[in-house]
Amino acid sequence: MGISGLIPLLREAQHPGHIKDFSGQTVGIDSYIWLYKGAFACASDLALNQPTTKYVSFFLTRARMLRHYGVEPLFVFDGGPLPSKLGTELERQRARAERRQQGIKLWNQSKRKKAFEQFQRCVEVTPLMAKTVIEELKREGFRYIVAPYEADAQLAYLESQGVISAAISEDSDLIVFGCRTIIFKLDQFGAATIFDRALILRDKDIGGWSDAQIRRMCILSGCDYVPSVPGVGLKRAHRYVSRSCDLRSAVQLMRNDKLAVPEGYDENVERAELTFRYQRVYDPRSRALAFVTPLDESAPPLADMPFIGVDLEQRVAHGIAVAELDPVSYLPFAQIVV
């Protein structure tokens, strides 16, 4: 998830903190992070299709903790699959299916500990599980939004619009999307590590870099939208970005170094950058879709960017956002048979 090694790399921009530091403020939460943590505890039940609400209890305990410290939470849930991540998602689904079968085999052999380890590795949070949590959040008066696509893009948009002051997550993609304040490693007692984008200036290697340069370094090091060229991590990507003016020229430097750059890589990294810049998100004020950052004169025609997410009519976008419509099928949840 996210950019491997990015959070340790930006340690100069982080400091210890506590959730009470955000008392009186609205903070967004990457909700699937908590859903997955809760699901790990009941992985066997989920893998064996046994009824369970343990993940709901875990989620609500964390939600109440935020309220206890005076924080107004805004829970943001992932929506439908993004075209840019189709390859990544298909590979993850294949791996989960294999691990589930391995786990069931071990379970039937009474090797419960090993089976549980496999079940934890194949945990998948579904829109119906998110819907179950949302219904409980509604009962307790918590606010929420289901993103049309990715929660991290939605959180970045909400922060840029002043709807939230910070975002709680474990996903370093939020940094690439441009979030200014991120609460990482939040524990059950409220302690956390706070990322402050303004403190990047302390970093001797990228202190003077623009957001675009940081984004390009992360893309070249490998992200969910495009894998890296073999042998290229953050350190080497930093070198190529520092010596180039855009992604194509950075990729040409890789070719000059005789790296195994695959065919079409130039186009793939540019699509990744456009996805980070213009992914579709939900605007709660207009109740319609928007872009994570506004389109500018450098943006290609929308017809050339299907990978940023399908445009949804206002009725569908709002229905997804308020958890009335399934974000994958667009059907009302009431019509979905479990």
Regions found by a protein language model. Give the residues of each.
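Short, intrinsically disordered/low-complexity patches at protein termini
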Residues: 98-99, 107-109, 199-201, 260-264, ...
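Hydrophobic transmembrane alpha-helix bundles
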Residues: 109-121, 182-192, 265-278
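Noncatalytic, basic helical substrate-engagement surface that gates or grips nucleic-acid strands
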Residues: 2-16, 21-150, 154-158
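Nuclease catalytic cores that cleave nucleic-acid phosphodiester bonds
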Residues: 123-266
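Helix N-cap / beta->alpha transition motif
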Residues: 30, 195-199, 313
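Non-catalytic nucleic-acid-binding/docking modules located in mid-to-C-terminal regions
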Residues: 18-23, 205-338
